[in-house]
Amino acid sequence: LSDMPTFSVVVPAYNVSTTIDATLASVFAPADRTAMDVVVVDDGSSDGAALRDVVATYPEVRLIAHEHNRGMCAARNTGIVASRGDVVTILDADDTLVADWPDVFLRMWSKWPVEANLCFAGCRNTAGTPTMRHPGFEGLMDLAAFISERYAGEYLPMFRGDYVRAKPYVDIGTRKSCGNISYIAWLHDTAIHISAEVLRIYDDESSNAVSRDWLKPSKAEENARCVEEELGRYAELFARHAPRKLAERWLKLAIYRRAAGRAGVWSAWARGARGAPLRSVAAALMVVLGPKATSGLVGLARAANMVKRYG
């Protein structure tokens, strides 16, 4: 596969010594693969010694350690800056690449428009279900399409290396990534190419999945901070391209503030209710019921496909 670009895989690692072996094994399993480098970033894990033991079984991997936990974006950015590849991807330490990933990647590369700095590869969960709203779609997603969530879902982000090393993730200091803030910043430069190829197996049942326990006070606090930062930076963009999505963000903020024990619950709800009156009824119910009941109701709704599971 000499015609393939060099490929960097960045794996942020925080207390994942029990899952990262499967992740790294999936990367190195194909015998015929592109020239590549793999960077694991230990983000101040409490199981750092066990992590080092696992990584040591893969001599090709470079391990970089943070002295203390700095959050997902900081870990990603440390790995990105250290990467060397023409293409850089971020692979979570509880996910895996598909068995034939070099062939899939080559097909993706051949269709990746030169004007796009980012490419979204498709994913499926461990049950084999696609995690994208439109699994067969292939093409460019511009800023308006992203803000309106036209192609919502869980994807594997891939970047042109020189671009992302110069413009890495926007880090607001949270443990979670608040990825929308970064994607909107990147979309101001170029559209994102969406590939119909599936490259990643997403373990949405993992105990480390960001969607789990999303209304625990600590996670709700971070979710609230993400939404507040997104609204502070991009409310005008949402108002112009997707006013309903702007209203829905205010409603989400009300729910997160309630779960985090924060003030400003009903003021956020009121701002969302004006633009999404029907959804505001459900949001008000969630606020009144509280996080425990809300989490159970949302889980049932997802299982019944009444609300989206990804994106």
How should each PLM-predicted stretch be described?
Residues 196-311:
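C-terminal subregions of glycosyltransferases and related glycan-biosynthesis enzymes
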Residues 26, 42-52, 68, 92:
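A conserved acidic beta->alpha catalytic loop
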